[in-house]
């Protein structure tokens, strides 16, 4: 199913963040953060609103530059070559005001020109084959998110970042996206996924990072995270209480 995906993510692990801060205009968002992501599979990032989750993912993807500190992939500092092996899906994806298929072929032309058949195959995988000629900007929220994921898969990433890609989507779209991500992970793609949905994290995560006020308070396997939270803040978050 994922024969066109790059399966070399293991060479980019571990991902290490060393003493990273992000302090634009003296607004401290990430503070002296140290983190190592060793595992393959799906890593979920959780935390309250404004905790720095999206900023952390953008730092990992190279969309933002740390004020200080270092980010490495497999002992190599984050660079353009590594970024070419990454893709990102945002909560509100930006799509071309063209057809669904044109959105795919445009992305395909940027990278390896894998061909029209692959574009159509990936659209079918995401349940979008009947929308090939449909204007992308007129799709439903769930369909737009599936198209964004299809474009990301077309890039053949070793590491795929997703920033709340299923927020406010219908259950069928959520189920399909989760299924695709599990299959991609099984094919060797490292998934780093932001969500507020505790049940979703239980379904898909291999390990969970909990961040609050720009600091990682916990990074454990999913079963430990939910059964034996290591910090008061984590336990309060899981109980639906926000500790300010």
Regions found by a protein language model. Give the residues of each.
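Helix-to-loop junction immediately C-terminal to a conserved catalytic motif
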Residues: 61
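Conserved ABC ATPase "signature" region
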Residues: 116-131
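Conserved ABC ATPase signature
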Residues: 135-139, 143
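Catalytic Walker B motif of ABC-type/P-loop ATPase nucleotide-binding domains
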Residues: 160-163
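Helix N-cap at the start of a conserved alpha-helix in ABC-type nucleotide-binding domains
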Residues: 171-173
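H-loop/switch region of ABC-family ATPase nucleotide-binding domains
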Residues: 195-196
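A short, surface-exposed alpha-helical micro-motif characterized by mixed small hydrophobic
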Residues: 201-203
């Amino acid at each position: 199913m994922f024969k066109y995906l790059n399966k070399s993510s293991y060479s980019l692990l571990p991902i290490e963040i060393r003493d990273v801060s992000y302090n634009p205009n003296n607004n401290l968002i990430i503070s002296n953060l140290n983190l190592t992501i060793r595992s393959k599979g799906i890593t979920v990032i959780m935390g309250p609103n404004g905790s720095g989750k999206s900023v952390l993912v953008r730092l990992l993807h190279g969309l933002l530059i740390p004020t200080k500190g270092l980010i490495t992939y497999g002992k190599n500092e984050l660079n353009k070559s590594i970024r070419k092996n990454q893709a990102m899906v945002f909560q509100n994806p930006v799509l071309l005001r063209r057809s669904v298929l044109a959105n795919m072929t445009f992305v395909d032309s940027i990278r390896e020109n894998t061909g029209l058949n692959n574009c159509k195959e990936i659209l079918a995988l995401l349940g979008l084959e009947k929308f090939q000629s449909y204007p992308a900007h007129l799709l439903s929220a769930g369909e737009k998110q599936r198209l964004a994921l299809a474009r990301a898969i077309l890039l053949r990433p070793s590491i795929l970042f997703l920033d709340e890609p299923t927020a406010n989507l219908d259950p069928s779209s959520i189920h399909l996206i989760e299924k695709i991500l599990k299959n991609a992970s099984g094919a060797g793609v490292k998934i780093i996924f932001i969500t507020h949905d505790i049940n979703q994290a239980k379904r898909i995560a291999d390990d969970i990072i909990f961040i609050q006020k720009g600091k990682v308070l916990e990074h454990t396997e999913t079963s430990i995270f939910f059964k034996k939270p290591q910090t008061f803040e984590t336990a309060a978050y899981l109980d639906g209480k926000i500790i300010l």
